[in-house]
Regions:
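Terminal transmembrane helix and immediately flanking juxtamembrane interfaces
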Residues: 2, 18-20
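Sec-dependent N-terminal signal peptides
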Residues: 22-25
């Protein structure tokens, strides 16, 4: 048993091919979970009464207010909540609020230029692309400085 734990701690078993394989398996599981989550939702509201994309709804609502020429209303909680509800046809949704600086309206107005589901997809894809870019940069840096550090 000691040999097993030593092998696990060393990290030698985790090859690049295994890391890619495990990552793809995890990605497939997440894709299935998201598909199931969307399948059991009621329109754009999940089973818990929250919007799909939860706090993205505040970004989309603020962008909608900006398109209507009323961006300052995003900083008024009651008006922002009303805008969040309006995104979902007036249904009761949790209040997420707008806590971003004014320059973030530039992002909000872009995602609010399309229907909510498309805006959410764009938001998630852009976030994931940024995540991958950072992970790639970290990976390159760690390859240059590869040092064995036992646990």
């Amino acid at each position: 048993m000691t040999h097993f734990w030593q092998g696990l701690r060393s990290g030698r078993w985790l090859t690049a091919a295994r890391a890619r394989g495990y990552s793809l398996i995890l990605l497939a599981i997440c894709a299935l979970a998201i598909t199931g989550w969307i399948a059991v939702s009621d329109g754009l509201i999940d089973r818990n009464g929250k919007p799909l994309g939860t706090d993205f709804s505040n970004v989309y609502a603020a962008g909608s207010l900006t398109w209507q020429g009323r961006p300052a209303e995003a900083y008024e909680p009651a008006l922002q909540h009303a805008a969040e509800k309006a995104v979902f046809g007036g249904r009761e949704v949790p209040f997420y609020g707008w806590h971003y600086p004014p320059f973030f309206f530039a992002v909000a107005v872009l995602v609010a230029a399309v229907p909510y589901a498309w805006g959410l997809a764009i938001w998630l894809a852009a976030s994931f692309a940024a995540y991958l870019a950072v992970m790639r940069a970290i990976g390159r840096a760690s390859c240059r400085e590869r040092v064995y550090h036992p646990v």
